[in-house]
Amino acid sequence: MAMTKKLYNLMDWAEIEAITYAEEDHPKAVLGAHPVRGGQTLVTTYQPKASEVSVKVKGSRAAVKMELADEDGYFAVLVKNKEPFDYELEITDKEGKEKTIKDPYAYPDSITKRDIQKFNSGINYRVYDMLGSHVMKMNGVSGVRFAVWAPNALRVSVVGDFNGWDGRLHQMERLFDSGIFELFIPEAGEGEKYKYEIKLHSGQTIMKRDPYAFLKEDNDDLAGIVYDLDRVPGSDSSWLDKRDEIQSYEAPLMIYDHGKTDFSKKDAREIAKYAAEYGYTHVTVSGVFDPLYIAGVDPEEIAGFTDALHKADIAVLIKWEPSAFSNDEGGLSVYDGTCIYEDGDGKRAYVPGSERKYFNLGRDGVKNYLLGNAMFLLDVLHFDGLVVSDVAKMLYLDYGKSESGWTPNMYGGNENLDAIDFFRQLSTTIHKYSSDILLISDDDTTFPGITASVDDEGLGFDYKINHGWNRDVLGYMRQEPLGRSNHYNEICFPMIYQYNERFILPVYDTADIWNEMPGDRDEKFGNLRTLISYFIMHPGKKMLTAQSPEGKGKEIQAIQTLIKDVIAFYNKNETLYSKELEPSGFEWINNISARENILVFSRRGNKKDDVFVVVANFANVPHKGYKIGVPRAGRYTEVFSSDAEKYDGFGFVNKNPIFSEASECDGRNDSIRIRVAPLSVSVYKYSPAKATK
C-alpha cells in the first residue's frame, strides 16, 4: 500500500536508516508517539520481524493499521489524537503469530539530569539504584527499566529472553548526550536473562554483561537476571541498635575467617553455631563476584544469611576486591570498545602474571561503580564491614612489575595517587553513611597512615591486617626450640611498629601451622598451644582460621578446648581488649632473655588495677622459681596457662596466688617467683596487696 503524502513528508529518512541499521542512540526522537500539525499524532515503530502492525488506542473501538514506511520493518501511522494517549501495538509476525505489546518508546526517561551529574562527579553513591535492571511501574504499567554506562558506544540495545536476543528491537536512549543509556521495556519481567548489545563506531557489535546486575547466572555465561530488589528486607533494627557497641575500638574483636560460602540458610546456621561455640564476635566470608556483584546467589538469600548471623549476635564482614577485573571479552574489559573501566595505558592496566586488569581509579564513572558496590553490600545486603583485598596492588604503580613495566605518577613516584584519593573517598563515604561500619585493609606493605584519619592525611581505614606479625612470629615458631635464641628479635620485632596502625593479627589455618611446627607430635601440639595463646595475649585485634590438625585423639580435642577457652578469656577480660590499640595498654617487662627464649610483658585495661602479667616460654625447658619483675606490689594469681592438663599439657602451673617481694628484677622494684612450663603461655592477674619483705 502506497504511503500517504502527508505521512511520507513526516518521515526523517536519515534517522529511520539509523534505526533500521541499529545505529541510533536517540531512538525516542524517531520511534513512539509524536504530536504533529493538524491535531494529530505520528506513531512509529520498528518491528523487523512483523508483517503487519496496528495501533490500538485505549478507549477506541478498533485498531488503526500502520503503514510499512520502510521495508526493513519501520511502520508508521497518523492517529487523530493531539493529547498524549495510552496505546498498544498489535503485531503479526511473518509466520502469522500475533501478540500485543506496550510500546517501550512511549514512556518518558526516568533517570534525571541531577542523577547523571552526580554520577559524572563520582558522588552518586547509590548508583545501583540508577544503573542496571530495575523492576518498576511507569505510568501504571509494570516492566523493567534498563540502564548502562557506555559513553563511547555508537548504539546500545538490551537483548534477552523477552526479545529473542535481537539487538534491533530495543535500542536504548542516550540521556542528555551523556554516556548513560536507558530504556523501559513493559514486556520484560523478573527472572528473565539479559545482556547489552553494543555497536562500536567501527561497525563491530559486541555482547556485554551488565556490571550492575543484582543477580547473574551461575555459569560461564553470567548473563544478568532481572531481579526485584524490593524483595530484600531491610536491616534488623535490633541488631543495628547494638552494632555500634560491638564494633567499637574498645570492644573485643575476634574474627573467624571462614572463607567462601554459598550464603544458604544451612551455611548460615552452621557458621553461626560454630562461631558462637568458639566465641567469635565476627565472621569473614567471601563469594563469587563478577566482578563485584555476587554471581549466582539471590540477594534476598544473602541478606537472609547476614541477618541469621546477626540474630546470633555475630557481625558479618565480606572480603571485597576492588582492585581488578577479569579480561574476558564479555566483561568490563574494553566495555564500549574503549577503555572506560581500565586505564588506556597498558602498563597501568594489566595485572602482572594474570588475565586481569586494574580499575582506572582516576575516572569518576569507575569510582562510582566501586563506591556504589560497597554501599550495596553494606546497605542492601546488610554486611557490617568490608575486608578490602589487594590494597598494596592498588597503592603502588610498580607492584609486582619490572623496572620498565610501569608508568610513574605525575611527580615521578610509584604511588598511585588516584588509589589514595579513592580510599579516602571510600572511607569518608562509608563512615558518613554509618560510623559503626568496619573498613579493614588487607595488605602487606609499609604504606604509612592506612588507619590514620583522612583529616590527618591518612586513608581512613578502621583496621589493617598485620601480615608482618604473622610472618615474623611464625618464622620464629618454625625454628627448633633450642635454635630460637638466634631468632629472638623476630618475636620481639612486631611490637616496634605495633601502634603505627590499628592492627588485626592474623593466624591462618592452624592445621597447616601444626604441620610446620618442629619436634615430635607432643612438641608440635605444645608449640601450637603456645602460638595460639601468645596470639590472643598480644596487643591487636584478632583473626583466626581455626582448623584443627587431622585426627580425633585427645590432643585434637584439647586444642579445640584451648581455642574456645582462650577466646572466652579474651572476650571477658577488658584488660586484653579495651586498650589493645593504645601504647598505654602494653609494657615490656623482659624482652632480653634470648638464651631462655622467654618473654614477659604486662597488659593494662582502663582501670588502675586492670593489670595482667603475661609470661611466654618458647623453649621446651621448664623453670622453677623463675624470677620476674612486676609492675607494682601486690598479689598475682595465675588465671590462665596453656600447659593446663585439660589442654593436654603437663599441668606445670601455679595453683596458689603469689605475693610480690620488694626485690628488684627486670628494672622493677618488685618481683615474683613462678613455675614456668615448657612451651607455654601463662597469665597472672594483679590485685592490690602489700608486698612481702
Predicted regions and their residues:
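Hydrophobic residues within beta-strands of alpha/beta enzymes
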Residues: V53, V156, V283, D384-L386, ...
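Alpha-helical packing segments of well-folded alpha/beta enzyme cores
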Residues: I271, E301, F305, V366-L377, ...
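Short glycine-biased active-site loop of nucleotidyltransferases that positions the nucleotide triphosphate
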Residues: E67, E173, N327-V334, C339-Y341, ...
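Substrate-binding/active-site clefts of carbohydrate-active enzymes
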Residues: A213-I225, L229-V232, D236-E415
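Carbohydrate-interacting/catalytic domains
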Residues: M1-Y256, T261-S264, R269-G279, F525, ...
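Conserved alpha/beta catalytic core and glycan-binding cleft of carbohydrate-active enzymes
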Residues: H382-D384, S402-S548, N571-I628, R632-D643, ...
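An acidic- and aromatic-residue-enriched active-site/binding cleft used to recognize and process polar
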Residues: P151-A153, D161-N163, K199-H201, V288-D290, ...
